[in-house]
A protein has these predicted regions:
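Glycine-/charge-enriched secondary-structure boundary and capping motifs
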Residues: 1-115
Length: 115
């Protein structure tokens, strides 16, 4: 209600992880660039990464790297949306908000790119 034009897409990161769920909500000719360094450390995920031999794509598909939901928002409204969500989640243990990437233009179908 507060940001009617600023939230462009939302994706619940379930089975299929980043590579299947994010492209479903993106327009053609866009790419979701995920900055791995901005994904918060998670002890359970760290344990899985160290315990199992998996490719990066398998980790992001199977374990979602601890990310459960993604919002794609207008870059000019990002800061105020971020603060609003932080305020809404302040009493929710274990739930937090992070900026982990951005959308860019590219040729072809929607993609997810890890950097």
């Amino acid at each position: 209600e507060k940001y009617p034009q600023a939230i462009h897409a939302m994706a619940h990161i379930t089975g299929g992880g980043f590579y299947e769920n994010i492209p479903r909500v993106m327009p053609i000719t866009t790419s979701c660039i995920v900055r791995k360094r901005d994904i918060p450390s998670n002890p359970v995920i760290d344990f899985m990464v160290n315990r199992f031999v998996m490719t990066e794509k398998e980790l992001f598909t199977t374990f979602n790297m601890g990310i459960g939901y993604i919002l794609m928002v207008d870059k000019n409204s990002h800061h105020s949306i971020f603060e609003t969500i932080q305020e809404l989640l302040k009493n929710q243990n274990g739930i937090s908000v992070h900026t982990i990437g951005y959308i860019s233009q590219h040729q072809g179908n929607p993609t997810v790119e890890l950097i």
